[in-house]
Amino acid sequence: METVQLRNPPRRQLKKLDEDSLTKQPEEVFDVLEKLGEGSYGSVYKAIHKETGQIVAIKQVPVESDLQEIIKEISIMQQCDSPHVVKYYGSYFKNTDLWIVMEYCGAGSVSDIIRLRNKTLTEDEIATILQSTLKGLEYLHFMRKIHRDIKAGNILLNTEGHAKLADFGVAGQLTDTMAKRNTVIGTPFWMAPEVIQEIGYNCVADIWSLGITAIEMAEGKPPYADIHPMRAIFMIPTNPPPTFRKPELWSDNFTDFVKQCLVKSPEQRATATQLLQHPFVKSAKGVSILRDLINEAMDVKLKRQESQQREVDQDDEENSEEDEMDSGTMVRAVGDEMGTVRVASTMTDGASTMIEHDDTLPSQLGTMVINTEDEEEEGTMKRRDETMQPAKPSFLEYFEQKEKENQINSFGKSVPGPLKNSSDWKIPQDGDYEFLKSWTVEDLQKRLLALDPMMEQEIEEIRQKYQSKRQPILDAIEAKKRRQQNF
């Protein structure tokens, strides 16, 4: 009798999480494998979908984050269905976190690849990446959506070399009644002039950012990266469009492509559809030319992981020996920091979306986050630490801080007079109370009497602010439980 060998049926590809999966606990549906890094609003993990065996990325967002912005990001991803845009599969509420399940891009971002290899890209590589990126932008712009944060760190590659747009934390929707948006948002060095000037902008603002990204891929960093971002903010609208530092290194086609992107007048700037017909893009080679650089970057990453794991194992060995030598009858309790087996993350602290993201730029260049420049990477590249903060360009924070300082200084120099209202007196934030020595006892007593009502007023304002943030979260959780709202 002939033996028939049964083959396991092929697992289907995950397209979207079904209703049954969404009603389960996420741990029943996924196995979380490792942390990838920190993205806009939350931590990102690599996980496997148990039913299909497909690798996914899960962004875990604390509900105390700006829920409205998170829901907007989910909404935009949910509406998109393009091979050039990172896919959204579904989301869960788990304790105090929102789990957002997205497509996993194993090669990371273009900026990761540049940093890991410590090399910029060739024209052929740039053309291939730009072609896919333009197809993604053409799709978004057709849907009347503006990405608003195009840069190498938000262009992800899968292991086959296909580029996909990611991180829609700052994306915007254009409606029929809103021809242009006026919100200042984005990453300073990549911002279009009209965005900085707040004169209204539309989809072609992304094209300017793409031109800056092309220079970033070619030179390792965008124009003005070596100067303070505050100065760059004023230079971008007033100076001529930026160009390559060494134009002679690049072909006429590539130079012209960048020139078409970096037209200061939005009305005269090329669209994504037009740029797809540009000779530089039309001559782009297939994604296979990206495989070598992807493999090289992944090899570097793997070696770093192995090195980190060896260091962890060595630390644990040393800690274990110290514990054994401590006492003949009692072993020292291992605390939170000593002897703990730390999982060697595949990426360092500065990851964005679902990829490692140590940008090449200094200081506060955050889009959805506020960045710091505490540590330096190899060469000219610096690490960017991302924390979950609402979207606010750093140059706006600079102005706000200056305004606060001016208020404090003017108060310290003012002559004390009758206190008309408790709100007239603001406590200096820098703790400098030297000016009080020049006040009379009567003035000091008036200020002292004003403290109690001022404190009650501040407490009430804080309570109202807390309630305004808390209620939408409670409403969203309740809606999720009733399954009336599926992200």
Curated annotation (Swiss-Prot):
Autophosphorylated on serine and threonine residues. Phosphorylation at Thr-387 by PKB/AKT1, leads to inhibition of its: kinase activity, nuclear translocation and autophosphorylation at Thr-183. It also diminishes its cleavage by caspases and its ability to phosphorylate FOXO3. Proteolytically cleaved by caspase-3 during apoptosis at Asp-326 and Asp-349 resulting in a 37 kDa or a 39 kDa subunit respectively. The 39 kDa subunit is further cleaved into the 37 kDa form. Proteolytic cleavage results in kinase activation and nuclear translocation of the truncated form (MST1/N). It is less likely that cleavage at Asp-349 is a prerequisite for activation as this site is not conserved in the murine ortholog. SUPFAM superfamilies: Protein kinase-like (PK-like) (SSF56112). Its cofactor is Mg(2+). Residues 433-480 form the SARAH domain. Residues 313-326 have a biased composition (Acidic residues). The modification Phosphothreonine is found at T3, T183, T340, T367, T387. Residues 303-332 are annotated as: Disordered. This is Serine/threonine-protein kinase 4. The gene is STK4.
